[in-house]
Amino acid sequence: MPQSEYAKVHAFLRLSPVSAVPPLFQALNSPGLFCTISREPSHYLIRSADGKEATLSVTALEAYNRPEMIAGFIVGTSDTPDLNGTLLPVAYDLVCPNCYTKEDIERKLVFQDRLTMLCPRCNRSYSLRNGGIVVAGEAGLKLFKYRIQGYSRASDVLIINN
């Protein structure tokens, strides 16, 4: 059975101001750039593919809205246009979907290069250019994709909601 475009897993994240976090701002506004977002006890850790890191404090509003994720998020803008010729921001879970689904193991993916994520456990590589499909290693599920709602430079707020 083919995998649906969006994951059936509930996810939610609201971050603001995006412009205060260079790796996140660049990933949302530059085709071919991605970053990861991990939740720490008092802040979010945002890391770009080239290893640059930034933190964003968890505000009372963000804590109240209760972020939900499996392992974190991968956020960015593909350099491959959709069928309308548009380059839209996308969000995936940071968890390896195959280790999580088959073994119930929450293994975080790492950047293999700017547009590829690697699972250090099962050695599958996932393309951020092609919708999160497996491009190396044993065949399997593509990355869990989530909806980005309401991001614009004017609002300066990122909302991931599934």
Briefly describe each language-model feature range.
Residues 2-110, 144-162:
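N-terminal pre-ligand scaffold of iron-sulfur
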Residues 99, 122-123:
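Short Cys/His-rich metal-coordination motifs, predominantly Zn2+-binding knuckles/fingers
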Residues 111-122, 133-146:
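Short cysteine/histidine-rich metal-coordination sites, predominantly Zn2+-binding motifs
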